[in-house]
């Protein structure tokens, strides 16, 4: 996965990219772990917002992105006007980041909680996406139509997906808009 906990201690300066195993100095902590993320939609989003809707999402309400450009393009293809917004992420080490390296029992429980309306305390959550098919399996599991074991048998054959939700206003400050592509 492109985003690893170790990357939280990758300091970025204007002159060079400096990788350190020591905890960075206070000034260096402000901008860390630079990477590119994409958001697919129907318009360019220069100033992302956390929109609270009636639909429950995998990791709760927030601004969703991915490191997989093709996935953002698939998200955009749902609309008449197809736009992929591009951002640099400069992670603030003070934020609470929850990362799921793969679809695990903990990942499933977290998504079930979020899709049931339960709030969490993380600023950013990273992990696999429950696409439409996986979502149907999760719904069947929640409804008791299939067991947990049956869920995993069905889910393990899906292709990899990735999502990052910026859940708080502080998390949104990590995003620096670079531009967009109209598809």
Language-model segment annotations:
Residues 37-39, 64-65, 85-88:
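Short, conserved beta-strand segments within well-ordered enzyme catalytic domains
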Residues 3, 17-34, 45, 58, ...:
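Conserved NAD+-utilizing ADP-ribose enzyme module
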Residues 54-77:
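Extended catalytic/binding region for NAD+/ADP-ribose chemistry, centered on the ART fold
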